[in-house]
Amino acid sequence: MTAELDLVSITQAPKALLHDHLDGGLRPGTVLDLARETGYENLPAQDETALASWFRTAADSGSLEQYLETFAHTVGVMQTASALHRVAAECVEDLAADGVVYAEVRFAPELHIDAGLTLDDVMDAVLAGFADGERQASAAGKRIKVRTLVTAMRHAARSREIAELAVKFRDRGAVGFDIAGAEAGYPPTRHLDAFEYMRNANSRFTIHAGEGFGLPSIHEAIAFCGADRLGHGVRIVDDIDIGPDGTAHLGRLSSLLRDKRVPLELCPSSNVQTGAVESLADHPFDLLARLRFRVTVNTDNRLMSDTTMSREMLRLVETFGYGWSDLQRFTINAMKSAFIPFDERLAIIDDVIKPGYAVLIG
């Protein structure tokens, strides 16, 4: 018998998550605890409910730049090794409880050195936290593998150094590199040296592109930088024309992305909050899925969007009428696009994802 498509059953479904920011997924209670422990005095609210509401409301700005301002508070309490370890471990526990079986969680080490930690200290603390979180999830009967993407801030000038850090820690759980931050005025081509370094090291990278800026950002990420995946990439829809009869006509760039099977790390709720799309109903996710782009479902920032992978999937089901087979396809898309070795990806697809959905499909 096919399981009902509700939040409870979707939570049971195995999921793969490619785009989730560590500093965007803290528990509100943890933010309060860490603020007290570290002496951070700038929080806009002092109880869990009010703080969670503030983050969601502040993130609902319709502007990527204003959305990013909310991170001052989470980053502000993540300046010690113990804080980073706790946040990383809780991240894994929360994802596992939501049915995520594989995740690539990204963070920018350069944002966590204000209190004296080195970049290596930051990496050590986060990776140890992930490992402890995996062990705690396993003890609770949840199977999850978490790896990390080491992120450089696109407005800064440390991307080559951060790329080297990603390669240095690639045998300890860092599976790739990323650049993030405001797109407008900070094109990915400012960081060509970092991307060339990653390619020469036979390492993988994704680029935030096509979220707060349009097709030029996507074009540069693919044509000049050689991105393996696109963080968001939602504005690729601007290169697709829909004729009077409903037929889609792809431009050169959108055709290239589809032909090359470039994974799109789509984050529906976040895209509405930042103004990339007006509403979930206006999100091009369904169009891109029907045109067989490699679409994936992601959370982006669970605290700011008050979301989980299960909630993101449910919102897509409610908006576009998807069934279990669609959710399985999006999950397999994500797992195929992960930055871990092929045999590990295949094992998770064959041994975890397909059997898990088979039970739900009936």
UniProtKB/Swiss-Prot annotation:
Residues of the site described as Important for catalytic activity: 232
The answer on whether this UniProt entry bears the keyword Transmembrane helix reads no
Indicate which residues the UniProt annotation says bind substrate. 21, 23, 181
As to how many cofactors bind and how, the note says: Binds 1 zinc ion per subunit.
Q: Which reaction does it catalyse?
A: adenosine + H2O + H(+) = inosine + NH4(+); 2'-deoxyadenosine + H2O + H(+) = 2'-deoxyinosine + NH4(+)
- Whether Metal-binding counts among this entry's keywords is yes
Where is the catalytic site?
211
Residues engaged in binding Zn(2+): 19, 21, 208, 300
- Lineage: superkingdom: Bacteria
Output the Gene Ontology terms for molecular function.
2'-deoxyadenosine deaminase activity; adenosine deaminase activity; zinc ion binding
**What name does this protein carry?**
Adenosine deaminase
| The organism of origin for this protein | Mycobacteroides abscessus (strain ATCC 19977 / DSM 44196 / CCUG 20993 / CIP 104536 / JCM 13569 / NCTC 13031 / TMC 1543 / L948) (Mycobacterium abscessus)
Please state the gene responsible for encoding this protein.
add
